């Protein structure tokens, strides 16, 4: 009797598995995306699936997995040989993936980002720092790294790293718990203190991982961190809601702009933007970053991947994703539409704001040529990675 029951249990289990797999899509009909959390409007997926059917006659289902930090891409593609069709790495990670042959070339017969007028020329220049031939990546969102400050606390405009690192803001300084961002801020600050003839260009600063530079950055950060607040994720919300002791914070422009406008916190609660918050790319220099989409080395559905890249570059889709992510697309038509929208102030965002606040916000989201000229692009660390990681371990424990 027990044997009969066991056989019946096995049959039921097998039938259950068959039924389960019968409802699964074939891998070649799935487009697998690996992206940061809350960075793409998933409402566009059904629209893409219909559009792809119209374009090719083929069916596809978009499936998404989210990562917490861009380094996960390296681990999963290089180490685990994950078969994601599309991944969303930042600039320096694109450079690394290209060097290790971990991404595939984009099919330029489907989408060619070098085509005249598709991408804003300034951001094509940014891309050439990590994808010189524009063969492996399609730009998604850009931004800068600088300083967010609460004018109601500082009572003065903050414009430099010298001010950010000064003792004036001891106990009121927020440092992003990100090795690359904190290191960049310290290196730009330290470079500005060198004699004029020995200073590096801003791009050279982002390529310097010498022992001497790492040690100097460690000393700067060690002093700063002894009287700073760590920003793991929520300082922007705390500052916007008046709950933080921070007056100045190392911040990405997209996060700064997000909490200046009407926004939702991580729990979905809506808040009015804080018009006492200001943002700057410091006079000594900053970072311009680009997040991209690439086709992974072990991708299966490369045709759908290329068509999805083309889809992302359509104006309406790029605008939707910009509005969802709180960042700005470098796709020219989307960029121009968003710029015109903010300049027209159709929703009254800039009513009753301080003199210069509108101009500051526009500059935050749409940096001028002068601002971009004092920004460098983060690079793959070819030498010095172990020393940099050791420095960070010593600092954060």
Where is each model-derived feature located?
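Conserved C-terminal helix/tail region of periplasmic/extracytoplasmic solute-binding proteins
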Residues: 358-397
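Short, low-complexity disordered leader/linker segments with a strong preference
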Residues: 1-31
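Ligand-binding pocket segment of bilobal, Venus flytrap-like solute-binding proteins
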Residues: 175, 182-186, 194-278
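Mature extracytoplasmic/periplasmic domains
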Residues: 24, 291, 296-371
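Hinge/lid segment of periplasmic solute-binding proteins
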Residues: 59, 65-74, 91-144, 155-162
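Early extracytoplasmic/lumenal segment of secretory-pathway proteins
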Residues: 25-100
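Short loop->beta-strand "edge-of-pocket" segments that line small-molecule binding or catalytic clefts
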Residues: 163-181
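Periplasmic-binding protein-like
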Residues: 113-116, 143, 215-222, 270-294
